[in-house]
Amino acid sequence: MEGVSATMHKLRPYLLMIFLQFGAAGTYIVIMATLNQGQNRYVVIVYRNLVAALVLAPFALIFERKVRPKMTLSVLWKIMALGFLEPVLDQGFGYLGMNMTSATYTSAIMNILPSVTFIIAWILRMEKVNIAEVRSKAKIIGTLVGLGGALVMTLYKGPLIPLPWSNPNMDQQNGHTNNSQDHNNWVVGTLLILLGCVAWSGFYVLQSITIKTYPADLSLSALICLAGAVQSFAVALVVERHPSGWAVGWDARLFAPLYTGIVSSGITYYVQGMVMKTRGPVFVTAFNPLCMILVALIASFILHEQIHFGCVIGGAVIAAGLYMVVWGKGKDYEVSGLDILEKNSLQELPITTKSEDDNKLVSSISDNSNVTIPGGAHSNTSGI
């Protein structure tokens, strides 16, 4: 019995991350279904982030009551900027691009997020790069490979891949319709998704700065969602003036904000943070390509989306680039941990307890890390 318990304890992080990827895949599906029903994307964003703020706020008030720092004008401006970058720009561009392409395509493109974050952090001198080191080469090459995969998906669609549950007549009809439409829609949709990805990466960079002066994860995430809901509401009032556009019924228009607010922000935030504490951000990010596969299968079955050969090839290339970047970043964490451990062994008294050493090591690594990999401990997890 103890052996079974020990095995389940070892498997728990893997099972939890697989569960989260199913939840993330569901986000793409329900959002796409809502957009297909004609719901304005900014109305969806308002409801989604409002639900997320309501879900996170009680936990923030209870668990961070004694550790929440005082709000300053500087932190407030950063929170407003974070709410504009992630909910307004990222989700706004991402949803529009998804509507022009597909949920499968969007989930594949979004795997270049770590690469884009690396580029922005490097430009801002927040990411150290040494060409002589293998880990830096891995991050650079992985970034180029990921961008190359996105380029392949943009320029090459390729033939349709027949699936056992697909309807050949429907695939032929949809393919004919797509050929008759302006191909620029596909390119424009890709550019919009990439713009959303850049905004999301900028969000992670700014969040890594903000968390140093406001180290209350739950409170910060709740405030970001609230700021995003308020700013999205202002945009939505301009683009959607008819009251009927704000109406929700017992369909995807009601289910989408509830699902994304509770699952994508509430449950995902808690589970992701719990796994990150024991296995690190690289472990969390490494499961992202599974979401792409799940979206492709579920969307083709429920939404009758087509899967093109170019999407498969490009997605595989992007996934390869993703793993190269997270491998290089993982080596950064290992080196950082060894440096801190060596420094502590030289500066501290030789007699300490194991728990004190562990706490100092974790605290030091947290204080000296640069930009958290997307999906890490400081992730708001309320993206697309």
Curated annotation (Swiss-Prot):
Keywords: Membrane, Repeat, Transmembrane, Transmembrane helix. This is WAT1-related protein At4g08290. It comes from the Eukaryota. Residues 25-154, 198-326 form the EamA domain. One of its GO terms (molecular function) is transmembrane transporter activity. Belongs to the drug/metabolite transporter (DMT) superfamily. Plant drug/metabolite exporter (P-DME) (TC 2.A.7.4) family. GO terms for cellular component: membrane. It is a multi-pass membrane protein. The chain crosses the membrane at residues 15-35, 43-63, 73-93, 104-124, 140-160, 186-206, 219-239, 255-275, 282-302, 307-327. It is found in: Membrane. InterPro entries: EamA_dom, WAT1-related.
